């Protein structure tokens, strides 16, 4: 979880996020992926240009409304033909306040981005600070969520997370 502003008492929606992805996997009201792969174009899911997170949040958009922020998987453009380019930036987070830039690299096909939608419980944390909702951003590189179910259902375009006997798994 990252709050590059250095102030955990304030939400992190003023951080600038970039995600190198033309598509994302929508989730239902229980946060289970629907099996669709949708374009980000023209939606609040489009972070192909670095943008302040708060400028994209639109609670009338069903995906944002259901999750009360971002908790979604993006289908990375850095993953093609079953291979990920771990030398290319797949996502980044920047704080104009601190000047800190975080760059994310992975060989995985997807990245789950979570904006602390269930933080802000009022529980005192480090130094007695009560973290607000949306205080931080988390990047989780991964296969697409609910992969075993979607593969079993024959969903096209879904990445398989099955580790077969004798095979090695390596993720970075």
Residue positions per predicted region:
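An exposed, glycine/acidic-rich loop-and-rim segment of catalytic or binding clefts
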Residues: 1-172
